[in-house]
Amino acid sequence: MITGGKHNEIHKKLLALTLACAAAASLAACGSSAPKQTASSGASSDASAAGTDAGKTYLIATDTTFAPFEFQNESGEFVGIDMDLLKAIAEDQGFSYEIQVLGFDAAVQSLQAGQSDAVIAGMSITPERQDTFDFSEPYFDSGVVMGIKADNEEIKSYEDLRGKNVAVKTGTEGSAFAESIKAEYGFTTTYFKDSSNMYEDVISGNSAACFEDYPVLGYAVSQDIGLKIVTEKEQGSSYGFAVNKGQNAELLDMFNKGLANLKENGKYQEILDTYIQE
């Protein structure tokens, strides 16, 4: 059982996640976004070859908090795998962009409405989404794991969830996986809009477990918030950079070319290693 000072410490860490989410959301609500990202001009010839309009700044929508892919650090900077990868690709290909911090559902809606040029938000490439969006080459292969309270010694597998409730985040692979097995293993689900509240529900004992993308939950566990992972990774989808179907082909082409270059020169792995320790 977590008590006293340890509980307060965990609560502060979860509160920090929640405040980061709220701060990012308020930026979007005020009509602002994270600072405009301008790539270096070193690869401008590549950008011209890809058919980029001179001086164009692409609007890229993202989630509010989906660590380690996008989140605000202690200095208030918006960082993460997605953010660092996009910055490096833009520098490699010589294009400019501006981040719109909207939340996942709102980011997708903004893209569909033509208010954004693309989405990068740990977005799984699925057949259903491919009917609506064109995706880049996969930039990350994900998967789903189950997390429980750190001092819980009773739950070790899906079989131990029978008769219990499980917390999931709306629109994630974790929620889809939970729905696919809950009839077999006899548990119910409660949905949350963000990871921090989902984690709090497990830590407080309202839910017995949560299902989450493994790099996201793995990063949260590394922050000592009071959770642990008890299952092996279930194979999941790959993440991709998305544009509306038939639109912004030049941006998609630059993303793919830049991604290939980063994988070749080692920068891609360097970015992953910054946030994920295997």
Identify the function of each model-found stretch.
Residues 25-29:
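C-terminal motif of bacterial Sec signal peptides marking the signal peptidase cleavage site
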Residues 31-54:
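Short, low-complexity, disordered segments immediately C-terminal to signal peptides
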Residues 32-33, 49-50, 98, 173-193, ...:
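Ligand-binding clefts/hinges and TM-proximal coupling segments of bilobed small-molecule sensing domains
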Residues 123-132, 177-180, 201-235:
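A ligand-binding cleft/hinge motif common to bilobed small-molecule-binding domains
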Residues 149-166:
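Flexible hinge/capping segments at coil-to-helix
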